[in-house]
C-alpha cells in the first residue's frame, strides 16, 4: 500500500509539473525571417465568414487598389457560424428580444434595444447599397419579410405591456402593436395558439418590418464579388498557423495548405481575425500584451427543425419568448420561420450543448490550447462566479428528446415528435475578459479588438453578431483607420450608409426615409407610422456630411 501511495504521489507531482510547463509554454508566434524586398499586401482577412466578407467589401469600395488576402481553413466560405443552418437567421432589431430590455426600479430600460435596432438599420443600408451596385443578387436570396413577435403568458404579461408602453415612445419602435386577445395572436402566429389552453393569459407585440436573413448567402455573394477583383485572393483549405510582427512594424501571417501540407507566409500592413470562435486562440499568436486579457468559454446550440409544409404554411413569424428568471441570454426560446436556399423551414430552440471546440469543425483540444498562464486564473474565477450558467448548461445537456418536445409545446402546443428533427447549430465562444483594476467577467455580446496602432484587429464574442456585421465592421474601420474614416473615406461611407454618424433614435424623419428606402430595395414590409411620411418611398435619402 505504501508503495502504491508513493507511486501515486510521484504521478501527481509529475502531472502538476507538466501542467505548469504547459501553462508557461510560449504562445506567441516566432518571428519569421522575411526578405527585405518581399512584397507587402494591404490587408489579410483570417476566416471566410460574414465579418471578413463584409470588411473585404468595405475595403474594395474604399481602396480599390488594395491587395487583400483571405484565408479559410474549410474548403468553402460561410461553413461555420455564418452558415444558414448554424444560426437562427434573425435580423436582430430589438423588436422581440426581451433580454435587450429590463425593468430597473420600476422603469423599463430600452437603450440596449434602441442600440441594436439602430445597428440593424445600418446593416439594411449596407445590403441595399450592395443590391443597387449588383454585388448582392435578388434580395429574396438572402433576406425575407418575417414579422417579429414577442410572446408571453402568465406573470410576464405585465412585463410585456410595460415594455410596449416604453418602446413606442422611441421612433425606432413606432408602429409596434400590442394585444392580449388570443384571436389576434392566432392571426399573427397560428402555430403558437393552436390547441393552447383557452384559460391561459397571453400577450404579444408585433413589428411588421422584421426579417429573416440568410447570412451564409450574403457571405457567399460578397466573396464571389470580391473574387472578381484582381487585387483580391482567397485561399480555402488553408489554416493560419502564426501571426508575428516584423521589425518594420508590418506583420507576417503564416499558413498551411491542409490538402498539400505546404506552408507559406505573407507580409501585411493590416490583419483582421474574423475566425468566429477561433478568434481568441488566433489572437494569442500575436503576442500582443492587449490580447492577454482575453479567454474564451465555448457553448454550442441545437435546434428542432421541420420542413413539413403542413406546419411551415401556418407560421410566418419569428416568435421570441422570455428567458426564465436567472437564465443566461442565450437561453431565450424562439420559434422561427426560416428561408434557406429557397426553402421554408420552422426552427425552435436553442438548446445549449457543451463542447471544448471553439468551432463546429474544430478540435476538442481548442479550449485547452487557448489556456495559458495569463488566463487560467481568470477562467477559473469566472467559472466559480457563474455557477448558474454551469448549472444551466448541465440541465440542457441532460435533456431528453421528450424534454425538448415539451419545451417546443410551450410555443407550439400541437407539436408531434415525428415532424421534427434535432439539428446541431454553430459553436459560439463567449468572451472572458480581465481589464486593469476590474474583476474578470463573462460577456455575452460582441467586442472589437484593436491593437494600439490599429494594425491587428479581431472580432470576439457572439450575439448579435452577423445581423449587425456591417455596423460592427464600420466601427472597426473607425478604430483601425480613424484618419481615413474622418477624411478621404468619409464621403464614400456616407454613400454606402446614408445614416452614418446620425442617431436614428432621435431623428424620426431620417429614420422613416431610411426604412422606406431599405424596405423598398430589400422587399421588406414597412408602412410608415409617422404622420409626415416621405412620399418618395423608393428614393434613397440624401446623406448628411460630417
From Swiss-Prot:
EC number(s) recorded for this UniProt protein: 1.1.5.4
Reported cofactor(s): FAD
GO terms for MF: 2-hydroxyglutarate dehydrogenase activity; L-malate dehydrogenase (quinone) activity
Pathway(s) the chain acts in: Carbohydrate metabolism; tricarboxylic acid cycle; oxaloacetate from (S)-malate (quinone route): step 1/1
InterPro entries with a match to the protein in the record: FAD/NAD-bd_sf (IPR036188), MQO (IPR006231)
Pfam families xref list: Mqo
Assigned keywords, A-Z: FAD, Flavoprotein, Oxidoreductase, Tricarboxylic acid cycle
Disulphides: none
Similarity comment text for this entry: Belongs to the MQO family.
Listed name of the protein: Probable malate:quinone oxidoreductase
Organism phylogeny: Bacteria, Pseudomonadati, Pseudomonadota, Gammaproteobacteria, Moraxellales
Gene it is expressed from: mqo
Amino acid at each position: 500500500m505504501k508503495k502504491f501511495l508513493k507511486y501515486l504521489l510521484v504521478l501527481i507531482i509529475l502531472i502538476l509539473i507538466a501542467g505548469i510547463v504547459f501553462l508557461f509554454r510560449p504562445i506567441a508566434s516566432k518571428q519569421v525571417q522575411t526578405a527585405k524586398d518581399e512584397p507587402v499586401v494591404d490587408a489579410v482577412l483570417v476566416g471566410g465568414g460574414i465579418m471578413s466578407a463584409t470588411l473585404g467589401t468595405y475595403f474594395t469600395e474604399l481602396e480599390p487598389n488594395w491587395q487583400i488576402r483571405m484565408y479559410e481553413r474549410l474548403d468553402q466560405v460561410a461553413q461555420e457560424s455564418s452558415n444558414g443552418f448554424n444560426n437562427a437567421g434573425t435580423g436582430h432589431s430589438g423588436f422581440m428580444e426581451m433580454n435587450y430590455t429590463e425593468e430597473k426600479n420600476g422603469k423599463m430600460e430600452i437603450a440596449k434595444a434602441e442600440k441594436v435596432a439602430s445597428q440593424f438599420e445600418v446593416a439594411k443600408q449596407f445590403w441595399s447599397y450592395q443590391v443597387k451596385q449588383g454585388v448582392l443578387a435578388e434580395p429574396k436570396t438572402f433576406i425575407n419579410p418575417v414579422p417579429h413577435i414577442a410572446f408571453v403568458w402568465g406573470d410576464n404579461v405585465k412585463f410585456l405591456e410595460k415594455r410596449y408602453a416604453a418602446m413606442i415612445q422611441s421612433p425606432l419602435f413606432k408602429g409596434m402593436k400590442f394585444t392580449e386577445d388570443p384571436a389576434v395572436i392566432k392571426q399573427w402566429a397560428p402555430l403558437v395558439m393552436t390547441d393552447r389552453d383557452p384559460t391561459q393569459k397571453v400577450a404579444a407585440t408585433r413589428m411588421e418590418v422584421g426579417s429573416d436573413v440568410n447570412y451564409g448567402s450574403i457571405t457567399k455573394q460578397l466573396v464571389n464579388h470580391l473574387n472578381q477583383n484582381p487585387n483580391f485572393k482567397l485561399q480555402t483549405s488553408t489554416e493560419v498557423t502564426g501571426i508575428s510582427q516584423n521589425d518594420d512594424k508590418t506583420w507576417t501571417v503564416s499558413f498551411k495548405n491542409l490538402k498539400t501540407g505546404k506552408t507559406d507566409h505573407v507580409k501585411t500592413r493590416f490583419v483582421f481575425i474574423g475566425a468566429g470562435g477561433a478568434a481568441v486562440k488566433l489572437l494569442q499568436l500575436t503576442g500582443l500584451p492587449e490580447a492577454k486579457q482575453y479567454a474564451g468559454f465555448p457553448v454550442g446550440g441545437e435546434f428542432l427543425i421541420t420542413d413539413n409544409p403542413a406546419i411551415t404554411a401556418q407560421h410566418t413569424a419569428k416568435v421570441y419568448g422570455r428567458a426564465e428568471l436567472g437564465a443566461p441570454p442565450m437561453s431565450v426560446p424562439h420559434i422561427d420561420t426560416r428561408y434557406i436556399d429557397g426553402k421554408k423551414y420552422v426552427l425552435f430552440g436553442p438548446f445549449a450543448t457543451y463542447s471544448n471546440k471553439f468551432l463546429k469543425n474544430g478540435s476538442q483540444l481548442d479550449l485547452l490550447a487557448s489556456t495559458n498562464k495569463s488566463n487560467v486564473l481568470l477562467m477559473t474565477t469566472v467559472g466559480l462566479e457563474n455557477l448558474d450558467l454551469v448549472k444551466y448548461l448541465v440541465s440542457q445537456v441532460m435533456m431528453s428528446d421528450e424534454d425538448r418536445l415539451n419545451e417546443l409545446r410551450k410555443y407550439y402546443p400541437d407539436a408531434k415528435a415525428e415532424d421534427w428533427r434535432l439539428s446541431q447549430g454553430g459553436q459560439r465562444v463567449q468572451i472572458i475578459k480581465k481589464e486593469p483594476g476590474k474583476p474578470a467577467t463573462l460577456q455575452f455580446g460582441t467586442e472589437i479588438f484593436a491593437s494600439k496602432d490599429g494594425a491587428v484587429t479581431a472580432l470576439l464574442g457572439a450575439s448579435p453578431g452577423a445581423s449587425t456585421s456591417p455596423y460592427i465592421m464600420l466601427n472597426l474601420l473607425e478604430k483601425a483607420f480613424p484618419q481615413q474614416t474622418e477624411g478621404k473615406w468619409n464621403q464614400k461611407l456616407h454613400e454606402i450608409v446614408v445614416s452614418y454618424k446620425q442617431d436614428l433614435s432621435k431623428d424620426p424623419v431620417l429614420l422613416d426615409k431610411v426604412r422606406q428606402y431599405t424596405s423598398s430595395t430589400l422587399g421588406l414590409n414597412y408602412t410608415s407610422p409617422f404622420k409626415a411620411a416621405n412620399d418618395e418611398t423608393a428614393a434613397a435619402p440624401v446623406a448628411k456630411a460630417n
